[in-house]
Every structure is written in C-alpha cells, then in structure tokens.
Amino acid sequence: MSDSHHTPEAASASLRHVRAKGEPRFPDGPKADPAGSHFERRIRSFQPRRSRVTAGQADALQRLWPLWGLDIDGRRVVDLAELFGNARPVVLEIGFGMGETTARMAAADPDTNILAADVHTPGQGNLLGLAERQELPNIRVANGDAIILLREMLAPGSLAGLRVYFPDPWPKKRHHKRRLIQPEFLTLAATRLAPGAVVHCATDWEPYAEQMLDVLTAHPDFENTVPGGGFAPRPEHRPLTRFEGQGLDKGHVVNDLLFRRVQHKEPPPNG
C-alpha cells in the first residue's frame, strides 16, 4: 500500500546490485503456463517506473535482503513455514508502495505473516527498514511479478488471504485489459488460497471498484462477505493511508471489497 497508486519500478532480480537508475529487468518464469501465456503477457502485477533509492533504503536492502527477502524467479516452490520460521497463516499483499501500512498491519496482527510483493526498489528498502526498526518478524518482502509468484512459487491452498490495495486503475478504456483484478487472475489466486481465505481489495477509482465487484461476484470460487452483496465498510484492520485521507478530504470515494474463498462441496460418490 502506498500514498499513490501502485506503479512500481521493475527492480534488479538480485538486490545485491541496487541501482537507483537501473534499466527495468523482469524475472523470467518457467515456460509452463497453466494460467495461460496470453494472460501473463497482458497482465502484470505492476507498472514499471523509476525512482531514486536513498542511502538508508540501500543500506536496508544490502543488510536485510538475505534475511527477509525473496526473489521471484519462478524456479522453486517456496516453503512458507521455512521462509517465516513458523507455521502461522500467510497473507500475500500485492503492491505495498513505501510499506508504511504493511508495517502497521503487521504490528497490529503479529500472529499473521505478511508476504509483501512489489518491484519498487525504494519501497522494498523502506519496508525492510521499518520491519527492522519496529521489530516485525512477520514481514517478508518479495521482489518481482506477483503473477509468477502465485503461479510458480506458492503451493496450492497455502495462503490465508490476499490483499490488493489501490492498484493501478488503468483509467483509459484501451488499457482496462491490464488491470490486475480480472477473472483469469482470480482463477489463479483461488488455487493458492485456502478455503475461507479472504481477498481484500480497495480502490479510490470508482469504475475500477465496480469492475472488481462485478468480476468477484461472478467468480464461482468467491463469495461476498457483505450480506446482500456490494462494497464493504473499511475494516478497522486496514489503516487509513495519507493518500486515502487526502482523497477523502476532496470528496473521493474509497471502496473496499471483502470476498471469501469458497469451499466447494465434493460430489457424492456414485452408487
């Protein structure tokens, strides 16, 4: 989560080589593509941008990445219990901006592990620094495309939740196909979410909110947690961001969506 929409810069596949103005590089996953190669080509979990890395962020990346970082390379299935050092539930957050809200949520719920994925190098360094200063052992930072992370590196049913806060709305009609929350993405995410896991999305772009509501409502693997359907009130566990507060002061509407992964009933045996 950030103070603006998530349009992260593509970072180096290895953060030991931190570049303030490096060329964008994207991790190449295996050729096998059960979710469909067309889906991956037109939808990524990020939009590249360039930003400067401060000395403090670079220091955090150099020191802490070997301890709390995960490169999304598509080469292995991650043992989440080994990654976090415990078997507590893991929530995947896609796009976290500078990480302030991620840190606040981790501090408020120490019994839940947060795997925060982004490619914005300054944000990665900032979140690692926050985790160290605030002593938050339940945060791990993943560098790369969350689509590859979901498809190639997370085991089926391994996630207790998914958070997508203020993703790029791609407001132009011809770019709507690039929005993250689409049926194909939800189908992929559903395979990695345990039954009962909650997908929590938030956006201040009303047309995107309506699209999110439509595709989540129509998807057979999810059900709205709001009685009667519709948008959810902002839950107390999601802090108000600075960006969000500024938008609310200007009369902007922020919509939250909370959908639960459905437990499908097994068909009765024949006979």
UniProtKB/Swiss-Prot annotation:
It catalyses: guanosine(46) in tRNA + S-adenosyl-L-methionine = N(7)-methylguanosine(46) in tRNA + S-adenosyl-L-homocysteine. Signal peptide: none annotated. One of its GO terms (biological process) is RNA (guanine-N7)-methylation. SUPFAM superfamilies: S-adenosyl-L-methionine-dependent methyltransferases. InterPro entries: SAM-dependent_MTases_sf, tRNA_(Gua-N-7)_MeTrfase_Trmb, tRNA_methyltr_TrmB_bact. PROSITE patterns: SAM_MT_TRMB (PS51625). Gene3D superfamilies: Vaccinia Virus protein VP39. The active site is at D168. Keywords: Methyltransferase, S-adenosyl-L-methionine, Transferase, tRNA processing. Residues 20-31 have a biased composition (Basic and acidic residues). Pathway: tRNA modification; N(7)-methylguanine-tRNA biosynthesis. One of its GO terms (cellular component) is tRNA methyltransferase complex. Catalyzes the formation of N(7)-methylguanine at position 46 (m7G46) in tRNA. Belongs to the class I-like SAM-binding methyltransferase superfamily. TrmB family. This is tRNA (guanine-N(7)-)-methyltransferase.
